[in-house]
């Protein structure tokens, strides 16, 4: 019986690894497409990336909890959203999107340092997370770290060249810097 259980466990773990590799390969391909596609096509690729990020690789219950938290955000129940995202993070500390969702809510609550801490974790797990990088830009604007904000938006442009908001934000930040020196 022990032998059967061990064989089953090894098979199960190999399937999880296979799913993870498949997901990583799909993301890698989408990021290549994101770099070369223009506006409309790139937007479709972006949506596919968000779909993968927002879907837990192995646990649909965590995906459902993340969506529940997102619903609380849409309803402006930010404290409840934080609770749910924190619960999801405790259950899987390696799911970048759970950290990203909580970082977003911390930003919305004006808790910029906590937001940045979560963004750091997102980027540790998924360095190409253009949403977290854009959020990092917003956090740095609030903290008046304008040069860091510009760097964040430049990184977004490297990952997602056809996204227009980074250019707009960089121009706005440059205006803020000019106003400081006047």
Predicted regions span which residues?
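Bacterial N-terminal signal peptides
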Residues: 7-15
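N-terminal leader/linker segments that initiate helical-solenoid repeat arrays
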Residues: 18-67
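TPR/TPR-like (Sel1-like) alpha-helical repeat modules
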Residues: 28-38, 141-165, 171, 175
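A conserved position within tetratricopeptide repeats
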Residues: 34-35, 50-53, 89, 123, ...
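Boundary/linker segments of alpha-helical solenoid repeat arrays
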Residues: 41-43, 57, 130-131, 160-172, ...
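Register position in tetratricopeptide repeats
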Residues: 55, 74, 108, 142-143, ...
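Alpha-helical adaptor scaffolds
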Residues: 59-126, 131
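Alpha-solenoid helical repeat scaffolds
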Residues: 97-101, 131-135, 151, 165-170
């Amino acid at each position: 019986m022990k032998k059967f259980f061990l064989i089953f466990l090894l098979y199960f773990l190999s399937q999880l690894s296979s799913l993870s590799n498949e997901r990583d390969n799909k993301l890698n391909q989408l990021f290549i497409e994101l770099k070369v596609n223009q506006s409309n096509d790139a937007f479709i690729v972006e949506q596919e990336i968000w779909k993968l990020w927002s879907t837990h690789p192995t646990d649909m219950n965590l995906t459902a909890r993340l969506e529940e938290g997102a619903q609380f955000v849409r309803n402006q129940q930010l404290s409840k959203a934080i609770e749910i995202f924190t619960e999801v993070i405790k259950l899987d500390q390696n799911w970048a999107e759970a950290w990203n969702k909580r970082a977003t809510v911390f930003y919305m609550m004006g808790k910029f340092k906590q937001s940045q801490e979560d963004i750091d974790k997102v980027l540790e797990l998924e360095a190409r997370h253009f949403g977290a990088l854009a959020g990092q830009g917003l956090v740095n604007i609030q903290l008046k770290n304008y040069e860091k904000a510009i760097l964040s938006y430049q990184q977004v442009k490297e990952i997602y060249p056809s996204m227009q908001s980074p250019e707009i934000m960089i121009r706005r930040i440059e205006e803020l810097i000019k106003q400081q020196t006047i």
